[in-house]
């Protein structure tokens, strides 16, 4: 197992942009997902829905409807990590370039998250996330 794989503890979430966050929440609740958390950021409304070990982050832009350009887009994948700094070091050591210069923070969940992203070969962001 390589140094990056050793840090990953599981899949964190799948990010789904939406034009109607309320309808999206209702749809996934119909499938049995529970609304786990919501957050309002300056540019987006965000909701996390969970079912067993599956987590979906759905978000709606306040300014631009359909900001990603098409309906049904999966915007990024995210994996849980147990130590964000050690993971960043392992990612850099593997020759991957983080999209931002520093580990970022968002006020999700109870105490927030710290995260960084890299691009896969198709330019899809892969996020590494530590829930605080």
Would you name each region that the model predicts?
Residues 1-5, 92-132:
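Vicinal oxygen chelate
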Residues 1-22, 74-77, 129-132:
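N-terminal beta-strand motif that seeds the catalytic metal site of vicinal oxygen chelate
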Residues 10, 43-45, 73, 109-112:
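Exposed loop/turn and edge beta-strand positions of beta-sandwich/beta-sheet ligand-binding modules
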Residues 16-56, 109:
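Core segments of cupin and vicinal oxygen chelate
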Residues 20-21, 82-85:
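Helix N-cap motif at beta-to-alpha junctions
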Residues 29-30, 90-94:
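Short amphipathic alpha-helices in soluble, non-transmembrane regions
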Residues 67-80:
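Helix-adjacent hinge/juxtasegments
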